[in-house]
């Protein structure tokens, strides 16, 4: 009997769950809002980040397709994209001033520390949010 081939979508979902489990102590114990990003549709966050942006749960936050358009104010998109690509290509962490958009309106100004994190052959970006002010 052959084993069912896993789709790329299933594989990426499994990776996000795996990294979340590996980082669970930090994600659930930290006072900071934190999110993990593989790509626009494969991401996770802790309850503090979900609440910061007005979501009832991390699952509700992660279910929204995309990333920059629904969550990041237009003025911060280039900054966050540059920080992300520097992390992915140069393996460098960074600190940036980012304005997030809240569900249902409003904004949150914050400082984001973005760190590249390898997991099972894939490179994620892990974002620690500080100094968040609505």
Indicate residue ranges for each PLM-predicted region:
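Short loop/turn elements at sensory-signaling interfaces that couple input to output
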Residues: 3, 112-133
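PAS-family sensory/regulatory domains
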Residues: 61-75
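Sensory modules in modular signal-transduction proteins
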Residues: 17-39, 47
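Per-ARNT-Sim (PAS) sensory domains and their PAS-associated C-terminal
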Residues: 88-92, 96-110, 121-123
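PAS/PAS-like sensory domain cap-loop motif
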Residues: 49-62
């Amino acid at each position: 009997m052959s084993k069912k081939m896993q789709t790329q979508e299933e594989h990426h979902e499994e990776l996000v769950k795996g990294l979340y489990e590996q980082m669970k102590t930090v994600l659930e114990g930290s006072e900071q809002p934190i999110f993990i990003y593989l790509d626009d549709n494969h991401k996770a966050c802790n309850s503090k980040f979900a609440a910061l942006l007005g979501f009832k749960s991390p699952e509700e936050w992660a279910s929204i397709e995309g990333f920059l358009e629904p969550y990041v104010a237009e003025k911060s998109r280039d900054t966050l994209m540059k920080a992300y690509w520097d992390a992915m290509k140069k393996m460098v962490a960074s600190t940036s001033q980012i304005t997030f958009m809240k569900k249902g309106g409003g904004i949150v100004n914050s400082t984001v520390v973005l760190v590249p994190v390898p997991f099972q052959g894939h490179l994620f970006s892990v974002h620690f949010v500080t100094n968040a002010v609505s």
